[in-house]
């Protein structure tokens, strides 16, 4: 059963944001990567069960509802969106879990708003000055006239979906067709979403995390860094640097997965999260 099949829209200053929720208890906010949405966490949420209030927003990363004109779609702007979402849901503090570019956003949130982050989990993400070549290439291509429509059409082809520059670098296994359709529908069908995505890609810069990642040294709360051993986008040295920078971090590696562990091989990730969240319960 897909525990995240139901979505509601939450009005925020940046525009309406789709949110999927499941369970009750300690709030756990789950942030996805590029051209995905909250569905990427469906197996993780199912594995965690009903004892946590799992919240999976659809951030403006290419599989979202259009943002308002002028909305800040930089990493700091999307971090502010996470805080606005917590405010809208009446949540003072949450465990923050980020994968891929969701992990970039989570780092900015923890650095800028540490009092709102009860604990931090980073899964295969950028760190410090890393800047994956596939995303740099996508950003260059997206800046070309008419490229957004062409890219959105091409990504609908299964062979293109398995290229390393697309989902083939994020997951070892093909993503189920119904889930892939949900990921791609906004980008393929809505020119405003394509415009948002171009804005996000155009605003990416290693300078952001070069500024924010070192500030995680001041984050004095429990943290977990999880890295797939076969990860193909984000350098493994980023895992070590993050774990060394975060004062209370543990570093764990998982097998048989690329970057998107929640989609690719969620079972070992769920086990690590259950243990981590269980330790939070015992220490509170």
Model-derived segments and spans:
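Catalytic active-site module of serine/aspartate enzymes centered on a nucleophile-bearing elbow/loop
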Residues: 249-284
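Conserved HGGG/HGGXW glycine-rich cap/lid loop of the alpha/beta-hydrolase fold
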Residues: 20-64
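Short beta-to-alpha linker loops that shape the active-site pocket of alpha/beta-hydrolase fold enzymes
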Residues: 44, 58-63, 69, 126, ...
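A short loop-to-beta-strand scaffold at the N-terminal edge of the catalytic core in hydrolase folds
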Residues: 12-21
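Helix-rich cap/lid subdomain of alpha/beta-hydrolase
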Residues: 132-185
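Conserved serine/cysteine hydrolase catalytic core
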Residues: 192-241, 253
């Amino acid at each position: 059963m897909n525990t995240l099949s139901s979505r509601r829209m939450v009005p925020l200053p940046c525009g309406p944001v789709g949110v999927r929720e499941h369970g009750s208890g300690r709030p756990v906010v789950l942030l996805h990567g590029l051209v995905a949405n909250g569905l990427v966490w469906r197996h993780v949420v199912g594995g965690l069960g009903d004892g946590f209030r799992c919240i999976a927003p659809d951030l403006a990363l290419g599989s979202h509802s259009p943002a308002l004109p002028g909305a800040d779609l930089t990493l700091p702007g999307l971090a502010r969106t996470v805080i606005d979402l917590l405010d809208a849901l009446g949540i003072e503090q949450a465990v923050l879990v980020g994968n891929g570019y969701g992990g970039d956003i989570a780092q900015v949130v923890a650095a800028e708003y540490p009092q709102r982050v009860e604990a931090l989990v980073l899964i295969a993400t950028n760190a410090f000055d890393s800047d994956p070549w596939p995303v740099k290439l996508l950003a260059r291509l997206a800046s070309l006239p008419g490229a957004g429509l062409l890219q959105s059409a091409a990504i609908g082809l299964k062979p293109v979906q398995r290229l390393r520059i697309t989902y083939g670098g994020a997951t070892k296994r093909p993503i189920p067709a119904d889930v892939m359709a949900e990921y791609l529908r906004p980008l393929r069908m809505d020119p405003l979403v394509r415009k948002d995505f171009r804005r996000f890609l155009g605003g990416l810069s290693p300078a952001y995390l070069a500024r924010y990642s070192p500030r995680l040294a001041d984050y004095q709360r429990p943290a977990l860094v999880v890295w797939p051993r076969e990860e193909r986008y984000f350098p493994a040295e980023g895992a070590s640097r993050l774990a060394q920078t975060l004062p209370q971090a543990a570093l764990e590696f998982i097998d048989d997965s690329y970057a998107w562990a929640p989609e690719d091989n969620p079972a070992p990730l769920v086990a690590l999260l259950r243990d981590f969240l269980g330790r939070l319960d015992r220490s509170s």
